[in-house]
Amino acid sequence: MVTVCERYEDDALMAEKYKIMKINVIGYIVNVYGCCFFFVFEGIRKRFSGSHFVTVVTYYPKYEDDSMPATTVRILATLILYMMMLTMIYSADTFTMVYLIMYKYKFITLKKYFENLREEFFALIDRGEHDMATEKLADGLVEGIKMHHALIGLSSDIYKAFGTVMALQVCQSSGSAVSLLLQIALSDQLTFIATVKLMSFVLALFFLLGLFLCNAGEITYQAAGVADAIFYCGWQSCPPRPKSDSRRNIRQLVVLAIMQAQRPLVMKAFKMLELTYGTFILVVRSTYSVFALFYAQHK
């Protein structure tokens, strides 16, 4: 992943990539731990109102046990859970997001490469160095095709590494959101803090799902723009074959490169569920539809 297009990465583009990564990761961590804060706050409120501090269900203590050791165990279990969540966030969720963003910016770098190749080609044409411009364009096309082929090959590696994580996130977000929304709708005894706690959990689930699906959809969008970048590289303004290598047909190279770039690159989960912007909207709508169906039957 790191070595593909590394020679042609622009400092400004890499700074933008790092900024996007930081926004995604920090936004997700704030969302998740904001949700956790409401869970703890609700537990503390119950404790001071004469009920139990329960945020995690454990074997010990029993629900009726309200002694100091039992309360201590509940607090320790909550702290351990939050530390485990931090490791899961960094080792699974944010790692997946970072790789998707890196992959997206590789395609942006490739498009910039073809745009720079076009500028260099026409700069040589303006100076009257037609042969050198043709040779540089031919060599640049070959280099770009190799990088594009390597990038397409990386999609299968990303699926093998992170496909299960993204697929489970789609299922978890939809199923958990329906359950939590029904709990809010069908319960008449929820306090305001408890309602905020559950709603923040639902928002955290959909926020992570949106980060996965929207970043994956952005890969499809950026990959689709490579074909246009190749087509406008300037091949129309040069002879079909460079003099130094008459076996190399520039127009044939362009046709093959565009054919390769026009194949839709769509990230998938379970090898069938497309990870795109449309899928995110579909999951949100389906979740609400299932919730509305169960709620209507209950009423």
Each predicted region: which residue ranges?
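Cytoplasm-facing ends of alpha-helical transmembrane segments in multi-pass membrane proteins
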Residues: M1-V2, A229
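Terminal membrane-anchoring module of integral membrane proteins
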Residues: I26-V32, E120-A123, R127-K299
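Helix-loop-helix junctions within predominantly alpha-helical proteins
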Residues: V2-L100, Y105, K112-H130, S179-F207, ...
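Membrane-spanning helices that line or support transport/gating and their immediate boundary helices
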Residues: V98-Y99, K106-Y113, E218-G225, A229
